[in-house]
Amino acid sequence: DKNSSEVWGGFRVGRRARVTLLKDSPNEVEAWHDGFGSLGRHRRKFTIDKDCFRIEDSVSTGVKAVSLIHLAPDVEIMSCSRTEIVTNIAAIRVAGASSVEIVDDQVSFTYNRFHLSKTIRIHFVKRLSYTIG
């Protein structure tokens, strides 16, 4: 697994990711970063409207990438496919995924105290978008 800055043993030892803000408006934010080095630039766009929240990812090279959605402990997954994840809160419609997996995870609610939760791992190459709502 790669992180967006080069890290070793919990200490940053490599160069920091360079982030460029492309758009910042009340309903849309878009930026890219080069923190994956030779793996290319990662570009992400967030769009919100009255009915949904949309996230679009693109990676400049053809590497296999993973987008993570960390769920709150009270969110339950009702069904999951490569194109749609249904929870007890909302539906997530996915376009561009090569696969989707649900993994057990933990979220910290205070120092050194955790709740069990789920994380959605969406695997893709080049482009991915998902809409929540």
Regions found by a protein language model. Name each.
Residues D1-S81:
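Catalytic and substrate-binding regions of extracellular carbohydrate-active enzymes
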Residues V19, H33, I92-R93, S99:
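Short stretches within intrinsically disordered, low-complexity N-terminal or propeptide regions
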Residues A31, V66, T87, D104, ...:
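N-terminal functional modules and adjacent low-complexity/disordered segments of proteins
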Residues G62, R93-G133:
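Beta-strand-rich recognition/accessory modules
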Residues I85, I89, R93-V94:
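C-terminal structured "cap/appendage" subdomains that terminate the fold
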